[in-house]
Amino acid sequence: MTLLINLSFLLSKPTGITTYALNLLPHLKKLYPTLLVSQDIPGYNCYPVPSNQTAEQGVKGHFNRLVWTQFQLPQIYRKLKSQILFSSLPEAPLCSNCRFVITCFDMIPLRFPKRFSPLTPYHRYYTPQVLKQAQHIICISETTAQDITKFYGIPANKITAIPLAYDRTHFHLLNLPTRNYFLYIGRQEPYKNIQGLIAAFAALPNYKDYELWLVGPSDRRYTPTLTAQVAELGITNQVKFLDYVPYDELPKIINEAIALVFPSLWEGFGLPVLEAMACGTPVITSNLSSLPEVAGDAAILIDPYNTKEITEAMQAIATNSALRSRLSSQGITHCQQFSWEKTGKATVEVLSRYI
């Protein structure tokens, strides 16, 4: 029996979904012969993905991949006589006899429909059919599990929440001196609330003594708005847009930050929170969605819609060394409960029900 794993949607640059999939593979390979439908990944048998359907091809690539998933993927499934298809994204063949387990990261497109309006048919018609036909659904947080039931009516007994983890060999305390910059890591979509973060930073009484580093790929839809806001507030010299930072450079940037500020309006998980805690960096994050699940009592939780609260939290960390020390210590302890070994073991337990 071969476990067929659909990774046809992976991007060459690491994202949350890519990180999740690549960290699960070693745990699955230990127990099952595996074949990956993906770009070449060293150490694994891979069925190549046609070049015209990769995520780098944009909307056309996504469309080609969905068509390929419906017609070509079932043929691979039958040829291998697989008992189950596992996909770390809610994409699977619908009109076939494929049995599949999928992972769902979040319901953000349904919570912020205006942002994702071009993809409305995908999220309103295709995704719910995949979820309904799946043998089982894995979610990365209790928040996402509840959202799936809320938006799609999927019964709770068909869903298992298995949290993400972080790379312990990569993200850890480096004992570097703290520099005077606040850090954000993530994309620039409006639900990430970067505009609120910029406004909160500008309201710091002594903002000129600090910098705000925004790490994440630039986006022609949103970057101009953010840079215009920075200019209007007169803080151009204090705000740095660092675009995409190589994975190997992230630990140093996180370790040296005075704090990670992650004020999202909604998240399926919020991996940067764990990575910052592992580095001993204090965390300010939202009191909404999955973020309290991830942060526990080891972070300052703020109302992301309240700019004043964000400013006050940043000011408190900037001026109170005892608070920084306490949050650093609590974060290092708290993040130890998350590991890819636990995530992998729990995932194997779900898959084993259908193999």
Residue ranges and their predicted role:
Residues 1-355:
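Carbohydrate transferase catalytic cores enriched for Leloir-type hexosyltransferases
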